[in-house]
Structures are given as structure tokens and as C-alpha cells.
């Protein structure tokens, strides 16, 4: 795929290897459906890469409920300046993630933590969540992980604005401001809808 080659540059061979893992091992392990595997470049790899422009240089990043490693692994491949933690409570998925980062030679800057967000007591510059839960629940899980001055980025679909409206009480309680943003990794890639949460002034 030309767009992915342009976006990932010299890291493209490793991204291709990750795609191979997603479309074989991840499907076999039940971490990705066969239909999703057929759309992995657009729907997953480039969709996750679109977050990059919202992440400051040299950030510490946690991917909450990482599953098969999305969006954490594509971002780690795209951005060597990031230190990425993949947080996943389920043993099977944690094993998959640990084996995958070894295969992709990412062990020096990507770690796997087997835990639920509410059990993990560390803070990060950027907290990521993709297909984990509605925003009103995500706030309670993700905000305690956000360092002072940090941000939460939740990859959402068309329901983003509705989820922000439904989470009004939680946003006020956590003193967070929500912005619905549209970003894309490449002009030929599908747009991604992201809810960015930052501390209110």
C-alpha cells in the first residue's frame, strides 16, 4: 500500500511484518476477526498512525486495553522517540503482545503491563484508548493515568460528539476539556475521529 509506505518510510518492513502477525496469529488467537484482517491497513494501521500528529515529541505513552497492540504498536513503529506501554488485563492478549514486540525488535522502548487501568499507578504524558469503552467510562479509567499537563486521546467513530455530550458530568468532575478532532495519516487514508481530553485552565 503506497500510503502506508509513505507514512512509515524505513519502518515499513516492520509494519508489514506486524500486519502479517495481525492477519495470521491474531486471527488464530481470536484477537482479530477475519473481516477486520482484510481491512487491516486502512482501518487499523493508518487509522492508528493518524494519532501521531497529536502526540508531543519524546512522550511517554500508555495504550489502555491494547488488545492486539492497536494503536500502541503502529505508533511505536512510526515514532522511535516514544516510550510506549501496552496495558492489557487479559493473559492471552498479554502473551501475544509480549511475543509480538520481541518479533518487531521493540523491547527497548515498548513494554507490556498486564493490568486494568484502575490497578495501574503510574502517570504518562499521553493516554490512548481505542475501542475500549464509551467516553463516560473511559474518563474514570484514563484520567488517573494522565500526568500533569498530559492528554488523553480516544479514537472514536461517528458517535464521538454524542459520547462527549453524554460524558458532560464526568468531564466537569474531572475538570477536563473535550475536543473532537479529525486527523488523517496521509491524504489518501481514511480520516480518524479523535476525542482529545486536556485539563481545563
Segments and roles (model prediction):
Residues 159-201:
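Active-site capping/gating segments
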Residues 79, 146-148:
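Helix-to-beta-strand junctions that scaffold the AdoMet/dcAdoMet cofactor pocket
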Residues 149-159:
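Conserved beta-strand signature within the Rossmann-like core of class I S-adenosyl-L-methionine
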Residues 46-129, 139-140:
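Conserved SAM/SAH cofactor-binding pocket of Class I
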Residues 67, 131-134, 158:
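Short glycine-rich anion-binding loops that position phosphate/pyrophosphate groups of nucleotides
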Residues 22, 75, 142, 156, ...:
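Residue-level signal for inorganic ion chemistry
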Residues 26, 100-102, 146, 168-171:
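Conserved hydrophobic residues forming the short capping helix/wall of the S-adenosyl-L-methionine
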Residues 1-62, 78, 92-105:
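Class I SAM-dependent transferase core
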Amino acid at each position: 500500500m503506497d500510503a502506508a509506505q509513505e507514512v512509515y518510510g524505513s519502518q515499513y518492513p516492520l509494519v508489514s511484518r506486524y500486519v502479517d502477525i495481525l492477519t495470521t496469529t491474531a486471527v488464530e488467537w481470536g484477537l482479530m476477526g477475519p473481516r477486520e484482517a482484510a481491512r487491516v491497513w486502512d482501518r487499523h494501521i493508518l487509522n492508528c498512525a493518524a494519532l501521531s500528529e497529536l502526540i508531543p515529541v519524546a512522550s511517554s505513552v500508555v495504550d489502555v486495553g491494547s488488545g492486539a497492540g492497536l494503536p500502541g504498536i503502529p505508533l511505536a513503529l512510526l515514532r522511535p522517540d516514544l516510550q510506549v506501554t501496552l496495558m492489557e488485563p487479559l493473559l492471552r492478549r498479554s502473551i501475544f503482545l509480549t511475543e509480538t514486540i520481541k518479533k518487531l525488535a521493540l523491547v527497548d522502548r515498548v513494554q507490556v503491563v498486564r493490568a486494568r487501568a484502575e490497578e495501574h499507578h503510574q502517570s504518562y504524558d499521553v493516554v490512548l484508548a481505542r475501542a475500549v469503552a464509551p467516553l463516560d467510562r473511559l474518563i474514570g479509567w484514563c484520567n488517573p493515568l494522565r500526568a500533569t499537563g498530559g492528554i488523553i486521546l480516544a479514537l472514536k467513530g461517528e458517535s464521538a460528539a454524542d459520547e462527549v455530550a453524554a460524558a458532560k458530568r464526568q468531564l466537569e468532575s474531572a475538570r477536563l476539556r473535550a475536543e473532537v478532532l479529525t486527523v488523517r495519516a496521509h491524504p489518501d487514508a481514511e480520516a480518524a475521529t479523535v476525542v482529545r481530553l486536556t485539563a481545563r485552565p
